[in-house]
Swiss-Prot record:
Involved in DNA recombination. The keyword rRNA-binding does not apply. This is DNA recombination protein RmuC. It comes from Salmonella typhimurium (strain LT2 / SGSC1412 / ATCC 700720). Keywords: Coiled coil, DNA recombination.
Amino acid sequence: MDITLMISAVVALAAGAVIGWLATKAHADQIRADLIEERRELDIELSAARQQLAQEAHWRSECELLNNELRSLHSINTSLEADLREVTTRLEATQQHAEDKIRQMINSEQRLSEQFENLANRIFEHSNRRVDEQNRQSLNSLLTPLREQLDGFRRQVQESFGKEAQERHTLAHEIRNLQQLNAQMAQEAINLTRALKGDNKAQGNWGEVVLARVLEASGLREGYEYETQVSIENDARSRMQPDVIVRLPQGKDVVIDAKMTLVAYERYFNAEDDYTREAALQEHIASVRNHIRLLGRKDYQQLPGLRSLDYVLMFIPVEPAFLLALDKQPELITEALKNNIMLVSPTTLLVALRTIANLWRYEHQSRNAQHIADRASKLYDKMRLFVDDMSAIGQSLDKAQDNYRQAMKKLASGRGNVLAQAEAFRGLGVEIKREINPDLAEQAVTQDEEYRLRSIPEGRQDEHYPNDERVKQQLS
């Protein structure tokens, strides 16, 4: 009985242990499954976190590149503003010099006018006041051409001064346009990589578009100071077509090429690691070097009819791409010069084109100044001839006045004058139709009688004029 109870107790105890172990195992399995599920979720979150960290690293790299380009653009903007201040200073000095010349011309014109008026007044003061209307009209016909030339000279000086004032106003407007263009170019530099993923033809068109904007902002006129896509046949009878030919004063030309490809720079800009970025950088430098050699072999300077300078401007349409290549390989400038090529970016090309535009403006001003000088020289010659003619007229008038006085003396002055003798005929009973001017005739007779009385000894006048009451009154 006791053994049976013990066995039953042992069996029950064993069964309970088995049941407990089974329950514990089931609970452990449940916990293990929960842990596995939780670990899987943690792995998913870890993978997402790693991807987010990779994206953040990429954006930090992109942000650093953009910050570098922004600092570069700020530096370029500072340099450009310094160049603008220098150009503005030179232009103001030139304008001041031109204004001084204009003031000198105006003063010279005023002095000539005053001298002419003084001369005319002196001549008119010595002229006979009884000159008839026909003589005055003759003088006016002589003075009118000179007056018209003086008025034309005054208008030309005023127009030149007004043009200078308008150019000063235009300069301030162009400076504002240049600042807006600089901001626009900076924005385009940030978005440019989206436009550089096409083929070489598309990139060449993009470069030509940027070049066209720079030319438009420079103030040069298409068809006058520059031409685009001009087709020229070389000595080998093959056609060459430079992108732009800029005309310079003194009959010179300069060629601009805008076909530089920037595919490697686009890969450099979008590279995600240093190795890829370095490889793209070397490819970009090699692309610039290859285009220098290709452009040098074209030998634009030898094209017939092209009065080109000894170098060609190789235009890189993206400012950061230009600065990156020269920063890593400064010797590219020397290599380009050996091939008669100058590397230019939008900023440096704009400064060069603005300088050319100013050269054209100074050329036009110089031609106008020469024209004014020629007109002034001709006016001076006309003035000299006019003064000589007026002097001759004055001498002729003086001589005519002397002849007039001599004739009037013979007519109505002195002893035996003509009018006195004519009046004597009238006293003898000669019939007349109309009397001579009574005042002049009386003066002539009176002077004739005075001369006669002076020639008669005193006390014997009555013997010669016994019945002449007028003579007696004169004697009394």
